[in-house]
Amino acid sequence: MRHRTIVCPLIENKGHYLLCKMAADRGVFPGQWALSGGVEPGERIEEALRREIREELGEKLILTHIAPWCFRDDTRVKTYPDGHQETIYMIYLIFNCVSANRDVTINEEFDDYAWVKAEDLKNYDLNAATRVTLSLKGLL
């Protein structure tokens, strides 16, 4: 089974949390709302977090606070466009982050993004991993 380590920034700005909607044809959770992240081979954890934020959310999003919050694991099944499926062991390293602004420019991994009040998070089609993370945080 392949292993994948994910750095998940839980980004808050003035009581709103950043969610990104995965592109319908990508990732383990296509078309669902999620938190970004991923670690490349040889990369340090915080370097990976900052790179992922830059690549997936743009250069203009300014984080004023980054702190490790928790980690967890599970397994997910990824379905490829040809119908092939793969079980992946996922390790999630979750960070509390505060942004100074909401200036986001998503890349091709996402179809949309939203800054969401805590009480409205339940109204989004969250992927299973994000739902667990937000529940652990007491936001769902």
From Swiss-Prot:
Its EC number is 3.6.1.9, 3.6.1.12, 3.6.1.-, 3.6.1.23. Signal peptide: none annotated. Residues 1-140 form the Nudix hydrolase domain. Keywords: Hydrolase, Magnesium. GO terms for molecular function: dCTP diphosphatase activity; dTTP diphosphatase activity; dUTP diphosphatase activity; magnesium ion binding. Monomer. Belongs to the Nudix hydrolase family. NudI subfamily. SUPFAM superfamilies: Nudix (SSF55811). Catalyzes the hydrolysis of nucleoside triphosphates, with a preference for pyrimidine deoxynucleoside triphosphates (dUTP, dTTP and dCTP). It catalyses: a ribonucleoside 5'-triphosphate + H2O = a ribonucleoside 5'-phosphate + diphosphate + H(+); a 2'-deoxyribonucleoside 5'-triphosphate + H2O = a 2'-deoxyribonucleoside 5'-phosphate + diphosphate + H(+); dUTP + H2O = dUMP + diphosphate + H(+); dTTP + H2O = dTMP + diphosphate + H(+). The lineage of its organism: Bacteria, Pseudomonadati, Pseudomonadota, Gammaproteobacteria, Enterobacterales. A motif (Nudix box) lies at residues 38-58. It is an enzyme of class 3 (hydrolase). This is Nucleoside triphosphatase NudI.
